[in-house]
Regions:
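Active-site-proximal beta-strand elements of phosphoester/diester hydrolases
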Residues: 45, 225-227, 266-270
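N-terminal secretory signal peptides that target proteins for export/translocation
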Residues: 1-7
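Bacterial N-terminal signal peptides
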Residues: 9-20
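Nucleotide donor/acceptor-binding cores
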Residues: 39
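Extracellular ligand-binding/catalytic regions of CAZymes and related secreted enzymes
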Residues: 23-36, 54-55, 62-66, 232-323
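Helical hinge/lid and interdomain linker segments adjacent to catalytic or ligand-binding clefts
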Residues: 27-32, 42-44, 48-141
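A glycine-rich, often tryptophan-bearing local segment used as a flexible ligand/cofactor-contacting loop or short
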Residues: 106, 110-202
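Catalytic beta-strand/loop cores that center a nucleophilic Ser/Cys/Thr
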Residues: 26, 64, 70, 89, ...
Length: 323
């Protein structure tokens, strides 16, 4: 990993070409002009279903080009082929980038990384630096083959370290689908008292194809920012399901690790690849990145969150599609 793929482009074909030859290297979008200039964001794509290998680079482009953040994108890479492979759960090259990161955007699901890679994530987590976590990141790790690993306690269903990384660090672990998967979508409802939170500045008409995840009780000092209303169909005009109550789909909390420094955490259980087509969702995630690094006073309700390159993602499913 001596090579770094540097991409600063408005065209998807160039992104595809660079990714094709640089899949063992981080994908880097240098920060442009904007309030985020000087902040380094490392974005990790490591889920098997929701096409984060397509949505996360698109988010990184927005953060870099529209807002000035320097962005490094890391992917799950097949050890045999050297290609991006979301179904690979034991290899995310380039995690050394976390040593110099100001923020991590995490999109992971049931990874079982080797100890030397997991150490980079845990060291970052314990350092007091912030995390923005999406969708399946409530259950990012699952140590089944190597329960002897010192990092096995971060498994989503760990009993002693209750709920593993998801519950302890981010606020909740995997419980169940609450809305019917791929049949019921989510309308975001902002609860009373949260309307003026900086993360929600300019956020309107929040909707996504994600089904609502079940939440038992958010841990620590978690504060729900958005509640998810289960809709009867996969259209924003679908009526609410009268049998379903509201569940948190976005919240903030702090996590204090071994450094003794409290870290800002933002978690959303939305994050379906099609959710990113919703401007309100994109703005919420971009705003969360500002808030996480202490730039909440710089959040604008009108600064562009439009895609830099055409965004025509593949449908979700447990298979790999290299960006």
């Amino acid at each position: 990993m001596n090579t770094v793929a540097t991409v600063f482009t408005r065209t998807l074909p160039l992104l595809i070409a660079v990714t094709a030859w640089a899949q063992q290297s981080p994908l880097v979008y240098p920060g442009g002009h904007g309030p985020g200039r000087g902040k380094h964001v490392v974005l990790i794509s490591g889920d098997q279903e929701y096409r984060s290998e397509e949505s996360i680079p698109a988010l990184a482009q927005i953060l870099a080009v529209r807002h000035g953040f320097h962005c490094t994108v890391l992917f799950a890479v097949n050890r045999q082929t050297g290609k991006i492979d979301p179904n690979t759960i034991d290899n995310i090259p380039g995690l050394e980038a976390l040593r110099h990161a100001d923020l991590v955007v995490l999109f992971a699901r049931w990874l079982e990384l080797p100890d030397e890679q997991m150490k980079e994530i845990v060291d970052y987590t314990e350092s007091g630096r912030p995390i923005v976590a999406l969708r399946t990141s409530t259950h990012p790790f699952n140590y089944r083959k190597h329960p002897e690993s010192p990092y096995a306690k971060y498994s989503y269903d760990h009993k002693q370290f209750s709920g593993g990384y998801g519950r302890q660090v981010l606020g909740e672990t995997w419980i169940a689908h609450y809305g019917a998967h791929q049949k019921q979508s989510t309308r975001g409802v902002i609860p009373a008292g949260m309307e003026n939170h900086p993360i929600l500045r300019g956020v309107r008409d929040l909707w996504g194809e994600s089904d609502v995840y079940e939440i038992t009780a958010l841990s620590g000092d978690s504060r729900p920012l958005v509640m998810g209303q289960v809709l009867m169909g996969m259209d924003p005009a679908s009526p609410p399901d009268p049998a379903k109550k509201l569940m948190p789909v976005a919240w903030t909390k702090t996590y204090t690790g071994s450094s003794g420094k409290p870290a800002r955490i933002f978690t959303s259980t939305m994050g379906h690849v099609m959710d990113f087509r919703n401007r309100g969702f994109r703005r919420m995630i971009v705003n969360a990145c500002y808030w996480a690094v202490g730039l909440e006073k710089k959040i604008s309700a009108t600064r562009s969150v439009e895609f830099v390159a055409p965004y025509n993602p593949h449908p979700i499913g447990v298979r790999g599609v290299a960006p």
